[in-house]
Amino acid sequence: MTPRTEGMKKISRIHFVGVGGAGMSGIAEVLLNLGYRVSGSDLQQNANTRRLAERGAVISIGHEARHVETVDVVVVSSAVEQSNVEIDAARTARIPVISRAEMLAELMRFRYGVAVAGTHGKTTTTSLTASILAEGGLDPTFVIGGRLNSVGANAQLGQGEYLVAEADESDASFLHLQPMIAVVTNIDQDHMGTYGNDFGRLKDAFVEFLHHVPFYGAAVLCAEDPGVRDILPRLSKPYRTYGEREGVDIRAVGIQRLGLQSRFSVLRQGAEPLEITLNLPGYHNILNALAAIGVATELGVADAVIQRALAGFRGIGRRFQINACLNFGDGEITFVDDYGHHPSELAATLDSARNAWPDRRLVVVFQPHRYTRTRDLFEDFVQVLSRVDVLILLEVYSAGEAPIAGADGRSLSRAIRVRGQIDPIFAETPEEVFDILPNVLKPGDVVMTLGAGSVGVLAQQLPERLGSEAVP
């Protein structure tokens, strides 16, 4: 067992409010494996809460003040309102209430921390980095926002010195972290309410995050992203750049996109070209792999280890996850599930699908996530969703937000219809999708469920339901 940090010796019982989230459950599992007594609450069960309960955590469904009566510290998800009864009770009892990132920072403080930030690609880049280190026998601890298929979990306590984790900019909590290596995959307009709807303030936060890296550490930055390029002149800490353009430190050349894989060579100063086969589709994942290669190069991982890890990478849950292939008429239907919920993510995922299956129709079931995001990026959603062949649009998954007029699923559906490229089908509830799909599917279709909300549950059910009901 890894020793507890000196300050944390005073702590025995740790309670998580909103424990079912990927980031929260991951930290809870690491602390559980370190020997702490972990409890948590959430509004509903999911795979994360069940996994924690199986490993000895005390999980409660629903929030009550009594859940925090005997704990030493309360860790709160950014998705939980500050008026939550458990938070109120903890403060009344003078129990420390901290953010997820504060607890992650404590775990990182006594390890060699690698923090992966960026609007898009954090989970995949963190997973690729952790997989390379594991392949090299470095046994890292990792906390990831999705399930790493090779271990069947989103977190693992390793015995090595490295801790690899996502750094969340959505609530600016990544500013708690003090990593040795920081990665920034991109800087895009999302969660803008945190930054007063000022893109400049968002970029300022990333600069501050990168300045938390010590002078003997390093940053690994994507030079293909305009937001990242904007901040480069402001950085005073060591950094490496990656991308496809000339002049970057870690450069991909000779890119071949081969269906669900990619091949390319990596050029690095003072090193032989590195031939890579990446077991992931999409140009965006080539960039994510370059980031992981940049970290591995900084840590001195052998090239052969990098090659094995990327060629054998088994993917992440809900990141271009192929759930099933079913016989359908004289062809088949392929079911793909992806967490993408921002227009840039949707565009990258759809591009990957078009490249993998250029002659097949894309039937997309999309659930918008948050009314504020739908409002702020409305026209971008209209543009990217108009490119698919068939669109079934669900109502917005609120994530606790109040509805906003003109930013709901029906409004988005109408705007896409007015654009004139496709005629979307609006589904009031996920259950309606089971009735709609059999009437629109054709042999050879690729069904893609996209979004960060409950559409992930629908994605798990579709192959079985349609396999028994929809074959013509």
UniProtKB/Swiss-Prot annotation:
One of its GO terms (cellular component) is cytoplasm. ATP binds at residues 118-124. Its main location: cytoplasm. Signal peptide: none annotated. It comes from the Bacteria. It is found in: Cytoplasm. Belongs to the MurCDEF family. HAMAP family: MurC. This is UDP-N-acetylmuramate--L-alanine ligase. It comes from Methylococcus capsulatus (strain ATCC 33009 / NCIMB 11132 / Bath).
